[in-house]
Amino acid sequence: MRTRQAGMSLIELMTVVVIVAILASLAIPAYRQYVLRANRTDAKTSLMFLAGALERCYTRYNSYTYDTNASLGCTVAFPQNSENGYYSIMTDGSVGGKRTASEFNLVAVPQGGQVKDTGCGNLSIDQVNTKAKSGSKSLAECWGR
C-alpha cells in the first residue's frame, strides 16, 4: 500500500505564485493612484485655509499684500509648505501665482513623491474662488465633485 504524501506539488505552488503576481500587478498601480489622490487633499485643504486667511486680511486691512507690521496689513507670508508637506504653496509668478493689494492667485506645487501626480499637477485658487489645475485630468477629478 502506498502512503500519500502531504503538502503541495511544485505546479500547485507555481499556480499560486502566478495568481498572486497577477493580483499584485493590478493592485499596486491602483494603490499608488489612490495615494496620490488622497495626498491631493493636503493641497486643497491648505489652499482653502490660506485663501480664507487672505480674505480675512482683505476684510480687515483692505489689502491682500504682505506686511511685517500687523497694524499695516496682512502678515500671511509665502512660500510655505502644506500641512503634510506634499505641496509648496506659492504666489510666485513663475508658477502662475500672483498677490497684489486687490487680488491673489495661490498655487500648490507638488513636492517629493507627489510630483508623480502629473494628471493634476499644480492646483490653484484665486480671490473669487476660481479653482484651476495644470495637468490633463478634469477639474472635477482634481478638485472633487
Show the residue positions of the predicted features.
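Residues at secondary-structure transition points
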Residues: Q5, R37-T41, T45, R99, ...
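Glutamine-centric residue-chemistry signal
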Residues: Q5, M14, L54-E55, Q114
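N-terminal single-pass transmembrane signal-anchor helix
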Residues: R2-Y34
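Periplasmic/extracellular, small/polar-rich flexible segments of pilin-like filament-forming proteins
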Residues: T59-R145
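Membrane-proximal N-terminal amphipathic helix
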Residues: L36-S63
